[in-house]
Amino acid sequence: MAHPSQLGFQDAASPMMEELLHFHDHALMVVFLISTFVLYIILTMLTTKLTDKLILESHEIEII
């Protein structure tokens, strides 16, 4: 039986509902892993300073 303060699903009453709960848990784990990986890639790209080693001094100003 569900309680007002319960954050999860009710207990499964049938085998089909139990399988749906397992599928839900698995799908959320996959979504969480993909989101974490994308966040890691974004943070890596924002924090990594990509500089060209061939352009030294102030040559980038001359290019503009």
Curated annotation (Swiss-Prot):
| Mitochondrial matrix-side positions | 46-64
Q: Which prosthetic group or cofactor does it need?
A: Cu cation
Q: Name one GO molecular function term.
A: cytochrome-c oxidase activity
Give the note describing cofactor binding and stoichiometry. Binds a dinuclear copper A center per subunit.
Coiled coil start-end: none
Mitochondrial intermembrane-side stretches of the chain, per the record, are 1-14
**Keywords, alphabetical:** Copper, Electron transport, Membrane, Mitochondrion, Mitochondrion inner membrane, Respiratory chain, Translocase, Transmembrane, Transmembrane helix, Transport
Q: How would you describe this protein's topology in the membrane?
A: Multi-pass membrane protein
TM region(s), chain numbering: 15-45
Task: Return the EC number.
Answer: 7.1.1.9
Localization:
Mitochondrion inner membrane
- For the protein in the UniProt heading, the enzyme class is translocase
Asked whether the UniProt record includes Membrane among its keywords, one would answer yes
Indicate where this protein is primarily found.
Answer: mitochondrion
What biological-process terms (Gene Ontology) are attached? electron transport chain
SUPFAM superfamilies, alphabetically?
Cytochrome c oxidase subunit II-like, transmembrane region
| Catalytically driven reaction(s) | 4 Fe(II)-[cytochrome c] + O2 + 8 H(+)(in) = 4 Fe(III)-[cytochrome c] + 2 H2O + 4 H(+)(out)
**What cellular component terms from Gene Ontology apply here?**
mitochondrial inner membrane; respiratory chain complex IV
This chain's function reads:
Component of the cytochrome c oxidase, the last enzyme in the mitochondrial electron transport chain which drives oxidative phosphorylation. The respiratory chain contains 3 multisubunit complexes succinate dehydrogenase (complex II, CII), ubiquinol-cytochrome c oxidoreductase (cytochrome b-c1 complex, complex III, CIII) and cytochrome c oxidase (complex IV, CIV), that cooperate to transfer electrons derived from NADH and succinate to molecular oxygen, creating an electrochemical gradient over the inner membrane that drives transmembrane transport and the ATP synthase.
Q: Which family does it belong to?
A: Belongs to the cytochrome c oxidase subunit 2 family.
Q: How does it assemble?
A: Component of the cytochrome c oxidase (complex IV, CIV), a multisubunit enzyme composed of 14 subunits. The complex is composed of a catalytic core of 3 subunits MT-CO1, MT-CO2 and MT-CO3, encoded in the mitochondrial DNA, and 11 supernumerary subunits COX4I, COX5A, COX5B, COX6A, COX6B, COX6C, COX7A, COX7B, COX7C, COX8 and NDUFA4, which are encoded in the nuclear genome.
What is the official name of this protein in its record?
Cytochrome c oxidase subunit 2
Give the species this sequence originates from.
Geophagus steindachneri
* Encoding gene, per UniProt annotation: mt-co2
